[in-house]
Amino acid sequence: MNIPNLITVLRVLLIPIFILLFYLPYNWSYMAASSVFAFAAATDWLDGYLARRLEQSTPFGAFLDPVADKLMVAVALVLLVQEHGNLWLTLPAAVIIGREIVVSALREWMAELGRTRPGGRCPTWANRKTAAQMLALVILLANPPAFTFWVLLGYAFLLIAGGLTLWSMLQYLRAAWPHLKTDGRKEIKLFESRG
């Protein structure tokens, strides 16, 4: 296993650590959990950079990197929804997690049809979405659930991330729609002929 893949595996292994820290009954536990999450988020940039720089990109790394990111974000969102328990956090969390489920299912279905990922990536929007998500999660994990300046700022960034996430999902579905309409009809006819 190469260095970038080891860093990605480390990111996955940090998830139970920030969960444990989050639930410790100490004043410093929120900040410790947030620090581990921030470190894990930084490794996301580092593993990609090293994979390109050292020419160590692998199919395993291409698979594991987004899985590690999605696991890390989903777990942090679940922790925060449970801890804060309000609409300002729950709604964007549902949008972010829901988008990952929809897009993952769409990618799998498109792959079964022999189609590649619809449309191109939009690095600028993807980077903004990721930055808003990570910033929101670092801020919210670091603070107990009270309406302080920092928590409200975290909510604001999470609402922005939720909006960008919804936008990216709609763009992805729009790009895939022509394939879904034509190939979907073929799939239905094939299914009906077998039935």
Curated annotation (Swiss-Prot):
Which EC numbers characterise this protein's activity in its record? 2.7.8.5
> Which UniProt keywords are given for this protein, alphabetically ordered?
Cell membrane, Lipid biosynthesis, Lipid metabolism, Membrane, Phospholipid biosynthesis, Phospholipid metabolism, Transferase, Transmembrane, Transmembrane helix
Asked if the Swiss-Prot or TrEMBL record annotates the protein with the keyword Lipid metabolism, the reply is: yes
| One of the protein's GO biological processes | phosphatidylglycerol biosynthetic process
Where are the membrane-spanning stretches?
7-24, 60-81, 134-150, 157-173
- Protein function: This protein catalyzes the committed step to the synthesis of the acidic phospholipids.
Which NCBIfam families would you find in this protein's record?
A: pgsA
This chain's protein is named CDP-diacylglycerol--glycerol-3-phosphate 3-phosphatidyltransferase
* Designated gene of the protein: pgsA
